[in-house]
Design a protein with these regions (language model features):
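Mid/C-terminal beta-alpha module of Rossmann-like enzyme folds, strongest
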Residues: 1, 188-252, 267, 272
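N-terminal Rossmann NAD(P)H-binding glycine-rich loop of SDR-like oxidoreductase domains
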Residues: 1-8
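NAD(P)H-binding glycine-rich loop region in Rossmannoid oxidoreductase-like domains
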Residues: 17-80
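Substrate-positioning beta->alpha
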Residues: 149-156, 170-193, 200-204
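Short-chain dehydrogenase/reductase
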Residues: 63-67, 99, 110-122, 151-155, ...
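Conserved beta-loop-beta element that borders a ligand/cofactor-binding pocket
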Residues: 89, 122-147
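Conserved Rossmann-fold NAD(P)-dependent oxidoreductase catalytic core, especially the SDR/UDP-sugar
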Residues: 13, 71-118, 136
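Alpha-helical membrane-targeting segments
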Residues: 156-178, 229-263
């Protein structure tokens, strides 16, 4: 995102606990997003804030930190009259919406993590509707590509093939699963943030509309890496067993519904507009 913003401005401030420069001209600002004063100082002088933070993939951490962080950012943007772009995921959609997700899909999350995402989304929409915040939501499907080290495609397929191991896929490799390419997500987020009439709306970031299955992803990666497309399925039983030893895998259990069925992310609204 910092690279893409270079197409629109030469003044980018990177805010994190330990920020690292991406562009030579980047300004670095150390802050804790759960600290109100830190956020107020970080936002000061900005035209647009891009909220792209990720907390540890842990329900208790999300419940504790996300509402505080969102409120701090909303308050800072209102105080400094700054626009806000919130980079979001699909966890708040209903289970029934997953086979064909659009910006108008019903919000009824079937998981505890999804409930946290619904809370912070509603906080943002309330601030837009009741307090005059100028903001938008840029929503992504599961990622692949540069920087997506924790994605299913990276951990389950690419990393294992590099190590000479079998790949794994979660639940069912015959189901469709949309994936957003990280450079496309960055490009789309930067473009939305710099498009005045995009504000006040939810946008799905540009994502390939090819309906590829897990098996097809595995075959594509195997062909590119010149290895055999060997894989196994990480089913509910295996997740439960591995979850006894791995917190990260344990946290995947409640998200299984996204892999038990087709998962198609429709980004045609973005593609028609841009």
């Amino acid at each position: 995102l910092a690279k893409e913003l270079g197409n629109f401005t030469d003044r980018v401030r990177l805010v994190a606990r330990n920020p690292q420069r991406v562009n030579e001209t980047d300004e670095l600002f150390k802050a804790d997003v759960t600290n109100k004063e830190d956020v107020l100082k970080a936002v000061a002088g900005s035209d647009v804030v891009y909220l792209t933070i990720g907390f540890e993939y842990n329900l208790n951490v999300w419940r504790k930190n996300w509402p505080v962080a969102m409120q701090n950012v909303i308050d800072a943007c209102l105080q400094h009259k700054t626009k806000l772009v919130f980079f979001d995921n699909v966890y708040l959609y209903s289970k029934e919406a997953i086979p064909h997700m659009t910006e108008d899909s019903p919000i009824n999350p079937p998981t505890k993590k999804g409930e946290v995402r619904e809370i912070i989304f509603k906080m943002l929409m309330d601030a837009i509707e009741q307090k005059g915040l100028k903001a938008l939501v840029a929503r992504s499907a599961d990622f692949y590509g540069p920087g997506a080290k924790n994605s299913l495609l990276s951990i389950g397929v690419i990393d294992n093939f590099i190590k000479g191991k079998k790949a794994f896929w979660q639940s069912d490799a015959d189901k469709i699963h949309s994936m957003t390419f990280t450079p496309d997500a960055a490009m789309g987020t930067a473009l939305l943030g710099n498009t005045d009439d995009a504000y006040g709306q939810v946008w799905h970031l540009p994502t390939s509309q090819e309906k590829l299955t897990g098996k097809e992803y595995i075959n594509l990666v195997a062909t590119a890496m010149n290895v055999k497309p060997r894989y196994y399925i990480l089913n509910k039983f295996l997740i439960a067993m591995i979850g006894l030893f791995s917190k990260q895998v344990k946290e995947l259990r409640e998200m299984q519904y996204q892999n038990d069925q087709n998962y198609f992310f429709d980004s045609s609204k973005f593609e028609k507009r841009f």
